[in-house]
């Protein structure tokens, strides 16, 4: 029996389609993005990237670049303060400062093609580019690792020599596997032995880039008073603040991040690449503001994509079409440093199904590719690809309807997720019923042209909403309009979706709201726009602020 729930429909603001508050500035070109930032005395930065996939840095000669007219400063990793193993928030995950420092600028080794090895600040872009090309680097080429099989081989070259891997709680050195974890409950082997059909398959996937339109950029000023001001295209200004401060070894209170519009992120703009480099070059250049804009080829070559890898999936069912057991190995590429989305993949992979016995083993594996990053429900698409492929094969083998099979095995309230968490209410059954009853599923496919294939598919997938902290301030003006300050980067019109929730409480049109996103000194901490959290979490902050405003107006 599928539970039904009543949903309130008599909203005056929520559920409508107003004109976005940021729409006019964006369609007329007046909106300010990171690449548009202009401040007095601005100079330009550029970086030298490694042409090699895996190599040891034997020496760097920057003298020719430093001697050029128009060059203010040259930077290598030795200019960074020593970073510890501490971690700071980077939106949908955390950043290890020691690893992140050598990711944004290599120290003793390069771990992927495009890895930054040096940077310059110069009077203009052309001079900066010319200076970068004068820097000489001596490399010792090393054998590259391009996939998880090579990385896990006994004789594999080691990418990160000081890595201490966590393999099911055991500390392991001389390894490319940063972490192995396992979630298991029920008697998995016994359940497979009692199954009427067992199918085991392995799927592989490549790293995929988010493909946002606007490239990474940052402008930074390290002023004489020790304070740093940053402008950066980011999904979270406070993440830029914490990472920049941590990498430079200064208090977060010394870093102010100004909000600029963001031209797409999809999870790929939660990490910093340029802000700390720009700040250090600014200090070495006498406090001049330094600006970086990444070129398109470097965006694809050296910024964080979604992880590729390999997933082994084994599923058992009985003759009635009920899943009896599942066992999966998730082997995802973290890139040149630890931290793939394998943890999230382990949560998502079996979450859509009510399975009495399961085993999930995850592997976070280093390869000579750019450090991976989030991309639209990080880890879930890879996991869904693996399990849904096998589910479809099971249905084909048993001659079962693919929606009905998913309904018969759907996770519901009380189902235990693969990592042990027990679900509260979830709407998967309602979604599947709606799909089964829709014209999209039941309409005829029509004639198939010669040489073509025409079909219709169904798949289930899972993602969890992020939580975290958000801040929203509301100020009622004398004319009845409302000034709204909130800390979430606007992706997809979140200014408006947040304002709509407050407007619903206040009983006024959302057009009477004037939303803005202040700098990090002028609004309370707010987490990243990512992890499916913003409309809910920042919206809840706006809702609570509106409730308090109503109470004050009544007094």
Mark where each language-model region is.
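Phosphate/diphosphate-binding loops
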Residues: 116, 123-124, 285-336, 540-555
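Short, surface-exposed loop/turn segments at secondary-structure boundaries that line and modulate
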Residues: 75-115, 150-163, 239, 257-277, ...
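Glycine-rich loop/linker segments at domain edges
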Residues: 16, 21-28, 92-100, 170-218, ...
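Alpha-helical support elements that line or immediately flank enzyme active sites
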Residues: 47-81, 118-139, 217-285, 342-347, ...
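Flexible hinge/switch segments at interdomain interfaces of large molecular machines
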Residues: 34-43, 213-216, 358-369, 469, ...
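Helix-loop-helix junctions that connect adjacent transmembrane helices in secondary transporters/permeases
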Residues: 158-248, 410-481, 500
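Intrinsic disorder at enzyme termini
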Residues: 1-29, 417, 432-449, 473-477, ...
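Flexible, low-hydrophobicity surface segments
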Residues: 1-172, 198-201
């Amino acid at each position: 029996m599928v539970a039904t729930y009543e949903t309130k429909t008599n909203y005056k603001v929520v559920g409508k389609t107003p004109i976005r508050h940021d729409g006019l500035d964006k369609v007329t070109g007046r909106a300010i993005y990171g690449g548009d930032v202009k401040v007095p005395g601005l100079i330009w930065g550029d970086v030298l990237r490694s042409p090699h996939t895996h190599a040891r840095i034997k020496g760097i000669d920057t003298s020719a670049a430093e001697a050029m007219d128009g060059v203010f400063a040259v930077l290598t990793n030795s200019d960074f303060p020593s970073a510890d193993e501490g971690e700071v928030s980077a939106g949908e995950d955390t950043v290890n400062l020691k690893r992140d420092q050598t990711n944004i600028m290599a120290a003793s080794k390069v771990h992927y093609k495009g890895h930054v090895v040096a940077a310059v600040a110069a009077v203009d872009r052309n001079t900066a580019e010319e200076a970068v090309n004068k820097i000489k680097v001596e490399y010792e080429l090393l054998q590259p690792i391009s996939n998880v099989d090579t990385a896990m081989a006994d004789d594999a070259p080691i990418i990160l020599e000081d890595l201490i891997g966590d393999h099911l709680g055991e500390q392991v050195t001389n390894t490319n596997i940063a972490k192995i974890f396992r979630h298991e409950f029920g008697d998995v082997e016994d359940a497979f032995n009692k199954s009427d059909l067992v199918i085991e398959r392995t799927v592989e996937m490549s790293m995929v880039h988010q493909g946002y339109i606007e490239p990474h950029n940052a402008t930074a000023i390290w002023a004489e008073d020790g304070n740093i001001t940053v402008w950066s295209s980011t999904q979270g200004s406070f993440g830029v603040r914490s990472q920049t401060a941590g990498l430079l070894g200064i208090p977060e209170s010394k870093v102010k991040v100004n909000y600029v519009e963001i031209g797409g992120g999809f999870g790929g703009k939660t990490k910093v690449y340029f802000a700390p480099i720009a700040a250090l070059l600014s200090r070495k250049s006498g406090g001049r503001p330094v600006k970086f804009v990444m070129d398109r080829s470097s965006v694809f070559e050296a910024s964080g994509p979604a992880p590729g890898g390999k997933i082994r999936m084994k599923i058992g069912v009985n003759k009635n079409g009920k899943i009896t057991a599942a066992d999966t190995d998730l082997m995802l590429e973290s890139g040149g440093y630890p931290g793939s989305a394998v943890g999230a993949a382990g949560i998502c992979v079996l979450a859509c199904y009510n399975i009495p016995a399961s085993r999930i083993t995850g592997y976070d594996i280093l390869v000579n590719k750019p450090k991976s990053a989030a991309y639209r429900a990080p880890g879930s698409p890879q996991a869904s690809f693996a399990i849904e492929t096998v589910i479809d094969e099971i249905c084909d083998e048993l001659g079962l309807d693919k929606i009905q099979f998913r309904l018969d095995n759907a996770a519901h309230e009380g189902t235990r997720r693969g990592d042990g968490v027990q679900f509260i209410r979830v709407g998967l059954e309602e979604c599947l019923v709606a799909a089964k009853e829709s014209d999209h599923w039941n309409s005829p496919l029509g004639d198939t042209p010669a040489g073509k294939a025409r079909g219709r598919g169904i798949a289930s997938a899972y993602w969890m909403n992020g939580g975290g902290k958000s801040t929203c301030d509301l100020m009622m003006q004398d004319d009845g309009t409302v000034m709204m300050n909130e800390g979430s980067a606007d992706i997809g019109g979140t200014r408006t979706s947040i304002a709509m929730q407050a407007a619903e409480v206040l009983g006024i049109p959302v057009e009477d709201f004037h939303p803005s996103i202040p700098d990090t000194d002028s609004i309370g901490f707010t987490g990243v726009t990512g992890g499916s959290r913003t409309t809910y979490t920042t919206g809840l902050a706006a809702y609570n602020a509106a409730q308090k405003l109503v109470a004050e107006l009544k007094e």
